[in-house]
Amino acid sequence: MDITAKTFDGQGGRDEFQRKNIAEKAIKLLKSNIDISPMVIDGSWGTGKTEFCHKLINLMKQDDTHNIIYIDAFKADHVDEPLMTVLAEIIKILPEGPRRKAFINRVLPAVRYTLKTVAKAGVSHLLRQDFADVANDFDEVIQKTADDSIDKAAELILKDHVEAEKSLKTLQTALTAIASQDPIIIFIDELDRCRPNFAVDMLEIIKHTFDVEGVSFVLVTNTQQLRASINHCYGQAVDAQRYLDKFIKFRFELSPHSQRHMTNPVLAANAYFYQLIGEKGFLSSSLLSNTLLKKFIAKFIGHQGLSLREIETLVLHIEVVQVLSNSNRFIPDEYIGYSLLRLVGVMLVCFRPDILREIRKGVVDADLLGDFLGVKKLPYLEEGGREIPEVCEFIMASLTTDFNENKVNYAISEDQQKKWNSYMRYVSYMEEVPYRDRAVAQILETANIMAFE
């Protein structure tokens, strides 16, 4: 389905992350008299910002109160002129006829001036480079003509300044006239993926050129990356957040949770994992309903902070393993531990191939795997204790005989191994702590399937 046509409800609609109410609140603000432009919809890469943006736009279009424009800044940054990008989209919403022609005629001076300024900057840069190469030969000539050049330069700067102010005023007046009939809301997406110069120029253009009544902007971006773009352009000495604050009036972060009003909120990524697995249907329902597997998926996604895009990557690789193994790697065995170890192999391929490379060399680093799974050390099991270890602790315990680097926090004594064996059988994780190389073999064999070995 075309992402631009996606909706929260209706035929083909979906709201699996329960974000419609977020969109409704954003729309309420955009329609209010509060000056919140530019507003930022913030979120990490892969959290579903673009899909949410299109669903919000389609929801808002139902009331037909605003002219709504969507700009994919990443696709537009090759033009290298944000002003042209925005104006071109505004022109598109005007019907063919006198109104569109009049608007184009009124904004042309500003466009011409912008292009002329860019061209001058390019020529000036080339002249400075040429001059630097032969500067020593022209010292005397420059000294004689310096005063005349300064006078002429000052005159040109003043003329350019007057022309700029005049062109800008004309452009803003034309925009105000258009927006007075139907307010304009411009959604600019993917600003965080643009070249730093284009992203910063877009912010400047929005603030200094499009700050007119009836025209609002919504930036859909990752502000952390936007700050990096600012530092790229102006240096690390610049406080990027304070610089950004000059351009943004209101910001909200797209929640990573799909169920936000519960004591234990559910991560959207966790819900998305089961949605994709269910849609594709390559894992059995009995396996998916296993308590330890569900706990492991939730623990790993939360610990790693996986994005929706990363969930898609993970599910794709699990499906690849199932296809290449004739559905023989993830099956509802008597013991779930083997499937979990194989799942660790898939996760290493997706997110930490560096650890996998070391394992292939024969280096099984307990600290690295523990950090990957969120286990700092194995718990000491008390005699008669009722506290059942967590699922990731079971996985680390099953690998204990394979660890050969940094294993002090994961070593199990003979007495402790008996207790681990008892717990493993109790929860149907595994019959006992495996012999050497047996557990790590599950990881490697699964990873090798994806390497076509």
Question: PLM features: residue spans?
Answer:
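Walker A/P-loop-proximal flanking segment of P-loop NTPase domains
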Residues: 1-72, 429-453
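The catalytic "switch" region of P-loop NTPases
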Residues: 1-11, 15, 23, 59, ...
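Conserved nucleotide-binding/hydrolysis micro-motifs of P-loop NTPases
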Residues: 46, 75-79, 223-227, 257-261, ...
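P-loop NTPase nucleotide-binding core
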Residues: 53-173
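Conserved AAA+ ATPase small/helical "lid" subdomain
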Residues: 103-131, 135, 251-331
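Helix-rich C-lobe and terminal helical cap/extension of kinase-like folds
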Residues: 285-408
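Charge-biased C-terminal accessory regions appended to nucleic-acid-, cytoskeletal NTPase
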Residues: 374-453
